[in-house]
Amino acid sequence: MDTSKDLICIGFEGTAEKTGVGIITSKGEVLFNKTIIYTPPVQGIHPREAADHHAETFVKLLKEALTVVPIEKIDLVSFSLGPGLGPSLRVTATTARALSLSINKPIIGVNHCISHVEIGKLKTDAVDPLTLYVSGGNTQVLAYTGKKYRVIGETLDIAIGNCLDQFARHCNMPHPGGVYVEKYAKDGNKFMKLPYTVKGMDISLSGLLTAAMKKYDSKERIEDVCYSLQETSFSMLTEITERALAHTNKAEVMLVGGVAANNRLKEMLDVMCSEQNVDFYVPEREFCGDNGAMIAWLGILQYLNGKRMDLADTKPISNYRSDMVEVNWIHEENNNSENGNIKSRIIPEHLIGKGAEADISKGRYLEFESITKERVKKGYRTSELDELIRMRRTVKEARFLAAIKELGIYAPSIFDIDKENKKIAMSYIHGKIAKEKIEEGSIDFCEDLGKIIGKMHVGGIVHNDLTTSNFIVSDNTFVIDFGLGKYSDLVEDKAIDLIVLKKSIMSIHYDKFDRVWNKIVEGYKTYNLAESVLECMKEVEKRARYL
């Protein structure tokens, strides 16, 4: 095929209950894009019924598409290889193979999740965004680094779309339920406290879902329950996006996926991005949910940059994670640069640091060098939830910074706590954060990080936000930022603590990951229960369902 001419690709999307066919050119012009959603006769989606829906509707959509673009003009066939429901993926792959063989054109299977990101970039001005991808089956925070889209944060159990749909079914709302939850939430005026579970850059939604169902069953107004569910879950999503933003220092945030159509979620992220001085993007509604155009576009990107597939390579992959894809179409020299410099988040000059939760300023407390950590109000959260979170985390951090010293772990000294304004004044530590040391090539000290984590776990303390930004290395190694910390002797909680750290290292220290992680594990093994925690880590990682 002559790749110098404008290619036309047809894309088939069928990972769950939506059947999509799209046609796009290599210049990014969408010639056809239509999706038909399967609405189950009873609650819930049966995989076989969804697959039958694809078998019927692909034929209809293909016929319609070929009235817009004649079949002889198709140069490439693309389809969603995964992740998704097995029966749906098989029907989609079979449809694509049949067309490819009948017109003798090449075929490309693509990752569904990354397709959302790339169509979002095509349809907005985003170049190198931190992406929040939210849908019925997926909840991920993604960032491109080191030839891959890294999963920096994700749900530890159910996806946000699934959470909203399950709640809607429980309340006898039609499918898809998220639309009706949003509608009811607009008329809610009473915020009810529900579980708010953030672990580093990951979230858990199952407890929130159960609690919301119980509120509904207890005869609370459905408008108020929907309002509280939406405010709580979307605040969690916005927070982990903000945490990932502080960790990666990206200059852009993009929202994609079916749940991206929710106006309240878009509003929250827009406010957060304004507070963090970064750009926010969301594609038009047509390209938020599952669609064939996004599949066709990623197929073109991969094909033009050398990707080729034989029919034997087109077997669907139901657990096809975003970080399994080798990205061949992004070239570093063109990736979000201004005059050759990579764009990054801008921190205000009066601060020495700006995290996801707090502004950090340097000063003096009596005769001592100090920093003040202020948990600032978050404009995206309701005032009730914001006050609760900031107060709880301010007090918790002060308590844990004192507690870990009793375990022989170095931490800043607390000078003063201003609970009313959510401020902590503490000693200034001369040193570099571990993130900077690793970027400079220093690795050996990472064994100390493992030992520190082991000591915390011996003392029953789980940090819940372990990243290389939360250790300061000087003559000794200090651990900071305990706002998400808790006491727990559960092996799984300790395993998740390590998983949070492991994912944060992979996201920005990918080229040094093995050396850094091995050093940390070596140090952690000084903890007498280390082996059981490390084994549990493997089990928890295997459970990652929403890919």
UniProtKB/Swiss-Prot annotation:
EC number in record: 2.3.1.234, 2.7.11.1
Annotated segments matching region Kae1: 1-329
Q: Which residues form the Protein kinase domain?
A: 346-547
Which positions bind Fe cation? Answer: H112, H116, Y133, D290
Q: Which GO terms describe its cellular component?
A: cytoplasm; EKC/KEOPS complex
Question: Reaction catalysed?
Answer: L-seryl-[protein] + ATP = O-phospho-L-seryl-[protein] + ADP + H(+); L-threonyl-[protein] + ATP = O-phospho-L-threonyl-[protein] + ADP + H(+); L-threonylcarbamoyladenylate + adenosine(37) in tRNA = N(6)-L-threonylcarbamoyladenosine(37) in tRNA + AMP + H(+)
- Choose any GO biological process term that the UniProt entry carries and state it: tRNA threonylcarbamoyladenosine modification
Record field: transmembrane: none
Gene3D superfamilies attached here?
3.30.420.40, Phosphorylase Kinase, domain 1 (3.30.200.20), Transferase(Phosphotransferase) domain 1 (1.10.510.10)
Give UniProt keywords alphabetically: Acyltransferase, ATP-binding, Cytoplasm, Iron, Kinase, Metal-binding, Multifunctional enzyme, Nucleotide-binding, Serine/threonine-protein kinase, Transferase, tRNA processing
Write out the annotated subcellular location: Cytoplasm
Listed InterPro entries? ATPase_NBD (IPR043129), Bud32 (IPR022495), Gcp-like_dom (IPR000905), KAE1/TsaD (IPR017861), Kae1_archaea_euk (IPR034680), Kinase-like_dom_sf (IPR011009), RIO_dom (IPR018934), tRNA_threonyl_synthase/kinase (IPR009220)
Q: Which domain of life is it from?
A: Archaea
Query: Pfam families recorded for this chain?
Result: RIO1 (PF01163), TsaD (PF00814)
Q: Which residues of this UniProt protein bind ATP?
A: I352, G353, K354, G355, A356, E357, A358, D359, I360, K373
Which cofactors go with this protein?
Fe(2+)
Enumerate the active-site residues: D465 (proton acceptor)
Sites where the protein binds L-threonylcarbamoyladenylate: Y133, V134, S135, G136, G137, D165, G178, E182, N262
> Which GO molecular-function terms appear in the entry?
ATP binding; iron ion binding; metalloendopeptidase activity; N(6)-L-threonylcarbamoyladenine synthase activity; protein serine kinase activity; protein serine/threonine kinase activity; protein serine/threonine/tyrosine kinase activity; zinc ion binding
Instruction: Describe the family membership recorded for this protein in Swiss-Prot or TrEMBL.
Output: In the N-terminal section; belongs to the KAE1 / TsaD family.
The function of this protein is:
Required for the formation of a threonylcarbamoyl group on adenosine at position 37 (t(6)A37) in tRNAs that read codons beginning with adenine. Is a component of the KEOPS complex that is probably involved in the transfer of the threonylcarbamoyl moiety of threonylcarbamoyl-AMP (TC-AMP) to the N6 group of A37. The Kae1 domain likely plays a direct catalytic role in this reaction. The Bud32 domain probably displays kinase activity that regulates Kae1 function.
Q: How does it assemble?
A: Component of the KEOPS complex that consists of Kae1, Bud32, Cgi121 and Pcc1; the whole complex dimerizes.
Q: What is this protein called?
A: Probable bifunctional tRNA threonylcarbamoyladenosine biosynthesis protein
Native species: Methanococcus maripaludis (strain C7 / ATCC BAA-1331)
